[in-house]
UniProtKB/Swiss-Prot annotation:
Keyword tRNA processing included in the entry's annotation: no
UniProt similarity note: Belongs to the MinE family.
Name of the protein this chain belongs to: Cell division topological specificity factor
Function: Prevents the cell division inhibition by proteins MinC and MinD at internal division sites while permitting inhibition at polar sites. This ensures cell division at the proper site by restricting the formation of a division septum at the midpoint of the long axis of the cell.
Pfam families listed in its UniProt record: MinE
GO biological process: cell division; regulation of division septum assembly
Keyword annotations from UniProtKB, A to Z: Cell cycle, Cell division
Tree of life domain: Bacteria
Amino acid sequence: MSILDYLRSLQKRRSASIAKERLQIIVAHERNGLSRRTLDFLPLLQKELLDVVRKYVEVSDSQIKVNLEKNGNYEVLEVNIALADAEGRFSMS
């Protein structure tokens, strides 16, 4: 393994970690007295998140789980994407 290969592998791990952290971000929107139409952006946000992931990683719809929950005054959008490891096995991120 050359030094360039090593540095590239570090970059990939760093990029993967950053992507994973970004996807694990829970979008919470406080709805104190706000109308329901203020949450209309959530489906568009979901689509854009998936488009960004698909730009860098090949994933099928079956590898993606999206959950929208209401917790009190908050709406929580959770996105989980199963990514293949080096051996091609999938695990939920």
